[in-house]
């Protein structure tokens, strides 16, 4: 791998990690669902000025936006609000990879390889260890942990929608898909914030 590619990969890792720190800081200033809604508001509208709507069925675009954008981040922001450590949340959220493998096998009939089964087994053991730590009071709130897992599952569902979208005849550009899908969760976030966070 070229040095440039390694540096770009490292930049992505750093940006991903800082994302959780920023969420943690932001939650000190405003409720989780409102913060998440504003995040997508700031992403969506500038993007709409530069990219056309992807030519895919609206049901797929809605499914993608409501899972990978709304579901994932609604649960994640609430998890951190309820005490889930930001660093641990970034790790637990990666359970999406194993949820994606399982969903892919069930929906697309993808065959599970031995190394994937071993990975899933190790992930389950890791989850059980974290649950045990939560139950014994080692500063891992059970509610925050379960909400993070729910976020990971929604991310996995979004991956399934993404695969269906990319199999469509008019395969959209990634930037168009990300930009327009960011528009979808704004209203759900604001409505849920009004209901759960209060006016």
Give each language-model segment a name:
Residues 8-9, 61-65, 90, 120, ...:
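Residue-level signature of transmembrane alpha-helical cores of multipass secondary-active transporters
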Residues 13, 65-70, 94, 148-156, ...:
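Residue-level hotspots within the lipid-embedded alpha helices of multi-pass solute transporters
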Residues 14-15, 19-23, 48-93, 101-103, ...:
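Specific transmembrane alpha-helical segments of multi-pass solute transporters/efflux pumps
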Residues 18, 22-25, 29, 42-57, ...:
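Membrane-interface helix-cap regions at the ends of transmembrane helices
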Residues 34-44, 77-111, 116-120:
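Specific alpha-helical transmembrane segments that line the substrate/conduction pathway
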Residues 41, 47, 64, 102-103, ...:
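Hydrophobic transmembrane alpha-helices of multi-pass small-molecule transport proteins
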Residues 44-47, 100-101, 106, 137-198:
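Transmembrane alpha-helical segments that form core, pore/gating elements
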Residues 56-60, 90-93, 109-129, 138-145:
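Loop-to-transmembrane alpha-helix entry segments
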